[in-house]
């Protein structure tokens, strides 16, 4: 994680929650290959929507489509060797072992993009400021476009592309452990030609382009240490032909440098660190609304390709973001960032919403659906606390982000006079209690292929049950303290922290809800009432 923001402490050692040893549990059975997104929505999500209408909408129809690989078993990556002399590609993430790189901690990215809409080509420069966590004779970064040139601390460096996005760097001089250094990467390419698997985070059409996705998207447009365990500051400049808008994260510093007749440069700055996938870039013809909502500057953007009545509806939804944030603040504490926003492109996205930091990306079909728009916005805005301010240490920690964002839909409804969150838990349990396939997907190890499946229901059910066991005072204090302590932390830390807020032994509860591949018994000890 970055140390540039004074709120970000040094990485904490993971706390082992010894009361819940995985070895004592039956092995998780592998599930079948995850079906295609559309088929999955029709076969699984639509029945759940009926439940959501009766209970409290979960917004499952708008979950993110991910890479579909066989499930994997959680493994602990080997500790980094402080005496090592070469950074390695991949951080040993159990689901995405090649994601990220070892040997350094990024402090800040300064990204400069030149976009040519005629050739649909990016020409870019990423300046990476980092601190070496070990002595480095060489290291890697992630970029799927063509690397044109690299310098390290001002001196030319050798580079070799390896695999899909690993770029090997050999600096002219070794980098000493604990020293700061700067890497400047020049690159170019057509993002539309970069593909991994059957989907890609790049969307183009109708004179607009957007790059946004989870768990991977940065490699399509900037050089990065592409893993959520290494958040960093973002400074993004995008040069486009005059008449186009270019949208990204953080605060809009300027939209035209004024020194070019035919081009505008849009400059965005994020003042709090973020994971690489939480950054995005959108280019096209957008209508913008700017202002201040209770002290928070906002920029909302909606594609001008959408009909006027749809733009009006989309803006009306986006303008509720401030009030939704204030509701979430009553549960999770102060909003963790200095800007708010949202963007609605014309493209048919493969997700309904994505928690890009300070400015979520919303699919037009999703935000124009009046039944789902409220829970969609609440879910993505809740991610500003859970998923953005506090990121996963590894991707198998996804419960700590998607679970809370989904529970926030229940909690916000309760806070604003809607159905009680406990009623939502009981109704969901009644519908799902006999669905063995659903319960086989555990929260401790959902498997890569099912990373974003059961968590949208089992996650909020677990949290509401935990609330019932801990009591409101302890549950909300614990959740606020967790959300207000920025950093990258594992699920094991979350369980250990929860235990520290109550005298109730949570070991049996976590065995039932986090570890077990079977339905939790309907008991008071498991949080039912």
Where is each model-derived feature located?
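N-terminal, polar/Ser/Thr-rich
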Residues: 3-13, 17-123, 203-208, 529
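Short, hydrophobic/aromatic-enriched beta-strand segments in well-ordered soluble domains
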Residues: 126-130, 143, 179-193, 234-242, ...
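Glycine/proline-rich low-complexity spacer/linker segments in large multi-domain proteins
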Residues: 177, 187-234, 286
């Amino acid at each position: 994680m970055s140390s540039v923001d004074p709120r970000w402490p040094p990485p904490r050692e993971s706390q082992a929650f010894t009361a819940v040893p995985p070895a004592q549990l039956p092995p998780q059975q592998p599930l079948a290959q995850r079906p295609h997104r559309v088929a999955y929505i029709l076969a699984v999500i639509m029945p759940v929507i009926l439940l959501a209408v009766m209970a409290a909408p979960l917004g499952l129809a708008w979950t993110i489509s991910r890479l579909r690989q066989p499930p994997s078993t959680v493994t602990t990556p080997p500790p980094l060797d402080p005496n090592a002399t070469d950074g390695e590609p991949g951080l040993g993430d159990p689901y995405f072992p090649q994601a990220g790189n070892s040997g350094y901690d990024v402090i800040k990215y300064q990204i400069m993009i030149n976009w040519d809409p005629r050739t649909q080509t990016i020409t870019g420069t990423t300046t990476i400021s980092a601190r070496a966590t070990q002595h480095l004779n060489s290291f890697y970064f992630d970029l799927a476009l063509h690397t044109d040139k690299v310098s390290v601390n001002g001196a030319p460096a050798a580079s070799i592309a390896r695999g899909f996005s690993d770029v090997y760097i050999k600096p002219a001089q070794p980098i000493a452990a604990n020293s700061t250094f700067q890497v400047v990467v020049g690159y170019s390419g057509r993002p539309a030609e970069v593909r991994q698997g059957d989907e890609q985070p790049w969307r183009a059409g109708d004179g607009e382009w957007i790059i946004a996705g989870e768990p991977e998207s940065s490699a399509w447009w900037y050089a990065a240490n592409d893993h959520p365990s290494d958040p960093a500051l973002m400074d993004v400049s995008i040069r486009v032909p005059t008449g186009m808008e270019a949208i990204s994260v953080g605060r809009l510093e300027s939209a035209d440098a004024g020194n070019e007749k035919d081009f505008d440069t849009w400059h965005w700055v994020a003042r709090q660190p973020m994971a690489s996938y939480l950054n995005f870039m959108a280019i096209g013809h957008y209508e913008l609304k700017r202002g201040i909502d209770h002290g928070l500057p906002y920029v909302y953007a909606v594609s001008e390709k959408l009909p006027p009545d749809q733009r009006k509806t989309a803006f009306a939804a986006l303008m509720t973001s401030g009030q939704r944030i204030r509701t979430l603040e009553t549960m999770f504490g102060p909003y963790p960032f200095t800007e708010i926003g949202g963007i609605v492109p014309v493209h048919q996205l493969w997700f309904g919403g994505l928690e890009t930091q300070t400015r979520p990306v919303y699919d037009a079909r999703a935000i124009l659906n009046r039944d789902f728009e409220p829970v969609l916005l609440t879910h993505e805005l809740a991610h500003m606390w859970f998923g953005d301010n506090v990121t996963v240490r590894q991707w198998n920690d996804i419960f700590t982000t998607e679970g809370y964002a989904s529970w926030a839909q229940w909690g916000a409804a309760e806070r604003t006079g809607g159905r009680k969150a406990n009623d939502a838990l009981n109704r969901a349990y009644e519908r799902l209690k006999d669905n063995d396939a659903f319960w086989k997907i555990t929260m401790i190890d959902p498997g890569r292929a099912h990373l974003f499946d059961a968590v949208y229901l089992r996650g909020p059910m677990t949290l509401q049950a935990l609330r019932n066991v801990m009591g409101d005072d302890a549950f909300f204090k614990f959740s606020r303290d967790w959300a207000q302590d920025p950093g990258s932390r594992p699920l094991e830390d979350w369980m250990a922290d929860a235990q520290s807020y109550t005298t109730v032994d949570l070991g049996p509860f976590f065995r039932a809800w986090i570890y077990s591949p079977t339905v939790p018994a309907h008991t008071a000890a498991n949080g039912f009432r």
